[in-house]
Regions:
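A short, Trp-centered hydrophobic/proline-enriched beta-strand micro-motif
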Residues: 117-125, 169
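Short Gly/Pro-enriched turn/cap motifs at secondary-structure boundaries
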Residues: 87, 114, 129-132, 156-159, ...
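Short, charged, solvent-exposed linker or helix-capping segments at domain edges/interfaces
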Residues: 180, 195-197, 221-228
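Short, surface-exposed charged micro-motifs
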Residues: 138-140
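Well-ordered alpha-helical segments within folded domains of soluble proteins
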Residues: 90-95
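Flexible, small-/acidic-enriched active-site or ligand-binding loops
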Residues: 136, 189-220
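Alpha-helical interface subdomain recognition
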Residues: 1-89, 101-106, 113-118, 133-134, ...
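A short core secondary-structure module
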Residues: 87, 151-195
């Protein structure tokens, strides 16, 4: 059993860390307060291969695996969770759905520009009335002579406001429940397809989250993604990989919060000494560090399994996502506490970690849903 990363993986970590600290860190609060992500940074992310990490080179990707992908997301999120989230949604959800279920023609038309960074992707499953109950989708797709007509709305779509391509689920047969849901590829500018309200969020503010609306949106037949009626089942498989990226996202922010708390504790002086000399603070830091390392093991175990052909990793990805996200919330909370009053001030990074990490216990399946997934796997239930 080998716990060390390869030299190539360590070099990737160093490269992404250098990029994040040099290109992202100086702008974190500016982007957060503006609730806007500058698209001009995307070519730089693409140049590093971060917009197509897990896809073969023949489709414009970097040809790497989930371990490298998790490393990249962790390092981006250590500096800014919003950037990590943008990259994660683009790779794990939209692009990966096309890679896993698309025809060769669809991969060449859509995956190549997505993986090479010439386009940005979004993925729409959640609806105003269908959150954890994703099988309760109400958006419809009705077949006609020219293909399909979509009507409905999705919510909480990461990258929805500026995505070039969007993979969305819609009901194609109301009599079949979740087996009547299909996936479609939408293109920016298609008549009847547009972004809706941009959400004003607690955290991850530089990652733009919005509604997407379908109003008599005509979709050609070749934009059906995967077999008709298999969109929901496909989505569940896509979420297995997506949860690894959210786990890595949480891990990165937890690591960042731990480092911020440690740095502050060594610098802040009270009663004539650094607060790091007080046992109560030392105990907090020790617990934080232990939890972060435990989360790291779960995250990279899941990533390792995802890189193995034919191995199911549903339980492990849910475990990693559940544990890492809840650890991140606890660590960020302690980071604020160690900072004291300054933890409540935007001049320090503690409050942003505190706001950002909460999403990880909600997005791509709440902590409660993860516990259900894990329990069903343990009990042998479908």
């Amino acid at each position: 059993m080998e716990f060390a990363f390869t030299e190539e993986q360590q070099q990737l970590r160093r490269s992404v860390r250098e990029f994040a600290e040099g290109e992202i860190a100086p702008h974190v609060m500016e982007w957060d307060e503006a609730s806007h992500f500058p698209m001009e940074i995307l070519p730089k992310l693409a140049e590093m291969g971060l917009l197509g990490v897990i896809f073969p080179e023949e489709y414009g990707g970097a040809g790497l695996g989930y371990i490298e992908y998790a490393l990249a997301i962790e390092e981006l999120a250590r500096v800014d969770g919003s950037v990590g989230l943008i990259v994660a949604a683009h790779n794990s959800l939209c692009s990966n759905h096309i890679f896993k279920f698309g025809t060769e023609a669809q991969k060449k038309k859509y995956l190549v520009p997505l993986a090479s960074g010439k386009a940005i992707g979004a993925w729409s499953l959640t609806e105003p009335e269908a959150g954890s109950d994703a099988g309760g989708t109400r958006t419809t797709a009705v077949r006609n002579a020219k293909g399909w007509v979509l009507n409905g709305a999705k919510t909480f779509t990461t990258n929805g406001h500026y995505a070039n391509y969007c993979v969305a689920m819609a009901v194609t047969d109301k009599t079949k429940g979740s087996h009547g849901i299909s996936a479609f590829i939408l293109e920016k500018g298609m008549p009847g397809f547009k972004p809706g309200k941009k959400e004003n969020k607690l955290g991850m503010r530089a990652s733009e989250t919005s509604e997407v609306i379908f109003s008599d949106c005509h979709v050609p037949p070749e934009n059906l993604l995967g077999p008709e009626g298999e969109g929901f089942a496909g989505s569940l498989k896509i979420l297995d990989g997506g949860r690894i990226s959210i786990a890595a996202l949480a891990l990165g922010m937890a690591q960042g919060a731990l480092e911020a708390a440690t740095k502050y504790a060594k610098q802040r002086k009270q009663f004539g000494q650094a607060i790091s000399e007080f046992q109560s603070v030392q105990f907090k830091l020790a617990d934080m560090a232990t939890q972060v390392e435990a989360a790291r093991l779960l995250v990279y175990q899941a990533a390792w399994l995802a890189d193995k052909k034919g191995v199911r990793f549903t339980r492990e990805s849910s475990m990693a996502k559940l544990f890492a996200s809840e650890v991140a919330v606890r660590v960020a909370n302690e980071c604020v506490q160690i900072h004291g009053g300054y933890g409540f001030i935007k001049d320090y990074p503690a409050e942003k970690y505190y706001r950002d990490v909460k999403l990880c216990t909600i997005g791509e399946g709440t902590s409660e849903i993860q516990r259900l997934v894990i329990a069903r796997q343990l009990l042998g239930k479908k």
